[in-house]
Amino acid sequence: MSEPIYKFFTGRFLPDWYQLSKEEQDSILAKLNDALAKLGAKRIILCNTYWSTDEWLWAGVEEFPNIEAVQKYMAALHELNWDRYTEATSLLGTKWEP
């Protein structure tokens, strides 16, 4: 049985994001949330970090049921041109119980 995969991420919007209308931005974000739900994944937390760093606007954690779900979600991000609108860094991990 596969174990959950946690994705820790930080990100910021690029200039192209701000060229979109509010409706276009909301549509993309809704599609991202739909993709998470369809894969059985969830966003555990999303934090504003703009007040604590010059580099990132947000940080968060998402939980995926398995690595295949992570890969499918990344494909969904690519289909939505997410990399055109954002710059981000992420790290995958599994639960550690020492």
Residue spans of the language-model regions?
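Short, surface-exposed basic-aromatic patches at helix termini and helix-loop junctions that form
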Residues: 75-82
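Short S/T/G/P-rich N-terminal loop/turn motif that feeds into the first structured element of a domain
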Residues: 1-57, 65-75, 93-98
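Conserved short beta-strand edge segments in small beta-sheet-based binding/regulatory domains
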Residues: 82-94
